[in-house]
Amino acid sequence: MKRTYQPHTTPKKRTHGFRERMKTKNGRRVVNARRAKGRKRLAA
């Protein structure tokens, strides 16, 4: 049985990347929350 998580950079960035987050109001909310918390990485 193969494992379910087979990571690929491009699809990951397309769905969870910074540019993608900035497109929606809620995405911007996510980034701002992570910024307020002091996360080193704001998006994937």
From Swiss-Prot:
Basic residues composition-biased segments: 1-16, 24-44
Segments for region (Disordered): 1-44
Keywords: Ribonucleoprotein, Ribosomal protein
Stored InterPro entries: Ribosomal_bL34, Ribosomal_bL34_CS
GO cellular component: ribonucleoprotein complex; ribosome
GO biological process: translation
UniProt cross-references to Pfam families, sorted A to Z: Ribosomal_L34
Database matches in PROSITE patterns: RIBOSOMAL_L34
GO MF entry, a single one: structural constituent of ribosome
Record PANTHER family: LARGE RIBOSOMAL SUBUNIT PROTEIN BL34M, MITOCHONDRIAL RIBOSOMAL PROTEIN 34 FAMILY MEMBER
Sequence similarity: Belongs to the bacterial ribosomal protein bL34 family.
Protein name: Large ribosomal subunit protein bL34
